[in-house]
Amino acid sequence: MGDVAAKIKIMPESVDTDLGELKEKIKGVIPAGADLHGDIVEEPIAFGLKALIVTLIVNDEEGGTEPAEEAFAKVSGVENVQVVDVYRI
């Protein structure tokens, strides 16, 4: 089996959420077996709301992104977590 890059969009609870603090919390809960690829990027959505885009390298086995999705969803200040792209590397 190989590895895949998974692009994950994390929506904060509100425009008032401190994205710098949220980025640090996200980095702190990346599960074993997943590695952060590059920086966590801010993506403008609308009306001042920005999503965080996280790219992780994970094993391509079934459910490879689930531990990360579950960990990110439990972080205080996170409204929603969605895998937007997965590709083999």
Curated annotation (Swiss-Prot):
Record-linked Gene3D superfamilies: 3.30.70.60
GO molecular function: translation elongation factor activity
CDD domains assigned: EF1B
UniProt keyword list: Elongation factor, Protein biosynthesis
Record's keyword annotation contains Protein biosynthesis: yes
Key word Protein biosynthesis present: yes
InterPro entries found in the cross-reference section: eEF-1beta-like_sf (IPR036219), EF1B_bsu/dsu_GNE (IPR014038), Transl_elong_EF1B/ribsomal_bS6 (IPR014717), Transl_elong_EF1B_B_arc (IPR004542)
SUPFAM superfamilies: eEF-1beta-like
Family: Belongs to the EF-1-beta/EF-1-delta family.
Biological role stated in the UniProt entry: Promotes the exchange of GDP for GTP in EF-1-alpha/GDP, thus allowing the regeneration of EF-1-alpha/GTP that could then be used to form the ternary complex EF-1-alpha/GTP/AAtRNA.
Name of protein: Elongation factor 1-beta
Species this protein is from: Methanosarcina barkeri (strain Fusaro / DSM 804)
Taxonomy of the source species: Archaea, Methanobacteriati, Methanobacteriota, Stenosarchaea group, Methanomicrobia
